[in-house]
């Protein structure tokens, strides 16, 4: 699996959410609404989610293993930092 495109939309208002990201996988599949969040230990990503009837948020799409999640997160945050530096 290759991430072939990353699109970053910076969030202008103050808060913990810094950007909303779309990734394209293998030039064939797009995942929208991945969030870049500023946490206590630095930046991390949150996969797209929806609020269930019980009030809990559940991921709509997410990696199955931690290595894939880490790879996606590293690529997104690298691109985010590059775009922020170029502003």
UniProtKB/Swiss-Prot annotation:
**Coiled coil (UniProt feature):** none
What name appears for this protein in its UniProt entry? Putative septation protein SpoVG
User: What family is this?
Assistant: Belongs to the SpoVG family.
The protein's job, in short, is: Could be involved in septation.
Q: Which gene encodes it?
A: spoVG
Which InterPro entries does this one have?
SpoVG, SpoVG_sf
Q: Name one GO biological process term.
A: division septum assembly
What's in the keyword line of the UniProt record?
Cell cycle, Cell division, Septation
Which Gene3D superfamilies does UniProt cross-reference here? Stage V sporulation protein G
């Amino acid at each position: 699996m290759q991430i072939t495109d990353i699109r970053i939309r910076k969030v202008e208002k103050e808060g913990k959410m810094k950007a909303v990201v779309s990734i394209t996988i293998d030039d064939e599949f797009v995942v929208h609404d991945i969030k870049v969040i500023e946490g206590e230990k630095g930046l991390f990503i949150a996969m797209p989610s929806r609020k269930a009837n019980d009030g809990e948020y559940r991921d709509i799409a997410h990696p199955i293993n931690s290595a894939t999640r880490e790879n996606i997160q590293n690529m997104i945050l690298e691109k985010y930092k590059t775009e922020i530096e170029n502003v």
